[in-house]
C-alpha cells in the first residue's frame, strides 16, 4: 500500500466513524464526553458541520459539530507530525463560522453569538511523539513577546496504543479505530498486497 493510499484509508475510516456512518452522532457524543469532565445530558442534539466547498478541499477530512454552545473541531488526524495545525484550524474555523452565521446577521448592530471553538487533532503516526501536546498559533509568529491579539490552541493527542492515552479507555470507538490502524500497519510491514482487507478480516473475527 502506497503512502498516499495509506493516508486515504485512515482518512476514510475516521470520517466514516465520526461524520458519515449511522452511528456517527453517537460516536461524536462519546468522543466529546471522553474529552470533557462533564458529559453531555441524555438526548443532547448535535449539529454536524463540514466545510465542503470545492475551493477548500484541504478541509475535506476536517470535521466539526456544534453542541452545547461549543464548536468542537477535529482537524484531520495526522499520521505525520505537523506543527502547522493551529494555522490550518484558523483557516477552518473562519469558513465554519461563515456557514453558521447568515450574511445579513454579520452587519447588524447587535452582536452575533458564536459557539465557543475547541480544537483537537489525533496523531497515529510511527514517528515517536509526545503523548499529548498543545500547539499554539502564536508560536509561529516571526516576532515574539508582548500580548498576542490573536492566538489559537490545538490539543494534539497521540492515540497510538502503546501511548495508553486515557482517552482510549474513555472512548471505545476511538480505541477500536486506533487498534485497527495498528493491525493494518502490521499487515503492511509483512508486505501483503491486501493489507487493508486482511486487517479488516482480522478485526471482525
Where are these regions (language model features)?
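Elongated, amphipathic alpha-helical interaction scaffolds
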Residues: 1-205
